[in-house]
Amino acid sequence: MDFVAKNLTKLRETNPLVQNITNYVVMNSTANSLLALGASPVMAHAMDELEEMVSIASSLVVNIGTLDEYWIPSMEKAAKIATDLKKPIILDPVGAGATKLRTKTALKILDFADISVLRGNFGEIAAVLGEHGKTRGVDSVAYDSNEAIELSKNAAKEFNTVSAVTGPIDYVSNGKELYAISNGHPMLSKVTGTGCASTSIIGAFSAVDEPLKAAVSGLTVYGISAEMAFAEAPYPGTFQAKVYDWLYRIDEKLVLEKAKVNKFEI
């Protein structure tokens, strides 16, 4: 897809500031992923600075991975400010379906905020749609390609957003169009925070294109980087470092050579 390659160049030219209200587990790896790609990360969740920070950010990423009584109001306030300012908001409902708190928090944000992209695994997206029993902790335990296609379309329509259901094949839909992305590698599941990083990378691309193409761009670039990383480092520890390297090294030429993206009209 030509637009993916062009968006990569645009991102590096503009160096967008991506505000992340994310979980403790992935702050470092997410920030490094964004820096390697060519974006600028900021991890800011203090209530007293949200208005200032959201106003200067290019996009907002909300990740519910480590919730508590302080972070939930921060996420909600930031999402409201970003909605008022018409900034792209990317929501990652980490572990939705595993506990009532996670599902409730994700649904509340989806209800009042203008979410540009909802990115999660099969179980998480199924949970926010009310289809239970497919999540264990923060990991999806069931995946069926046909179900994932329907899930992506249905979530997009239900929440009036772009829905990205990630797994062996990533499906991205706005309810009218559907993209299938076959890039990536199973080793991503052996390193914590890779899904969270992909969400923040979508946030970076949301600064340079509309939500559907931003999500496709982010997942394609991250998937190709993972493939290239595994070819050089087939073990989890060195693989993670190589993903950073390839997020830095990937260029338009490599995207055009390696992208495995198909578009379908719904």
Curated annotation (Swiss-Prot):
Family: Belongs to the Thz kinase family.
Function: Catalyzes the phosphorylation of the hydroxyl group of 4-methyl-5-beta-hydroxyethylthiazole (THZ).
Pathway info: Cofactor biosynthesis; thiamine diphosphate biosynthesis; 4-methyl-5-(2-phosphoethyl)-thiazole from 5-(2-hydroxyethyl)-4-methylthiazole: step 1/1
Pfam families: HK (PF02110)
NCBIfam families the record matches: PRK09355.1 (NF006830), thiM (TIGR00694)
Domain of life: Archaea
Name this protein carries in UniProt: Hydroxyethylthiazole kinase
Keyword Magnesium attributed: yes
Catalysed reaction equations from the record: 5-(2-hydroxyethyl)-4-methylthiazole + ATP = 4-methyl-5-(2-phosphooxyethyl)-thiazole + ADP + H(+)
Cofactor(s), by name: Mg(2+)
Top EC category: transferase
Residues that hold ATP according to the record: R119, T166
Annotated GO biological process: thiamine biosynthetic process; thiamine diphosphate biosynthetic process
Annotated substrate binding sites: M43, G193
UniProt lineage: Archaea, Methanobacteriati, Methanobacteriota, Methanomada group, Methanococci
EC number: 2.7.1.50
GO molecular function: ATP binding; hydroxyethylthiazole kinase activity; magnesium ion binding
CDD domains linked to this entry: THZ_kinase
The entry's keywords: ATP-binding, Kinase, Magnesium, Metal-binding, Nucleotide-binding, Thiamine biosynthesis, Transferase
SUPFAM superfamilies: Ribokinase-like (SSF53613)
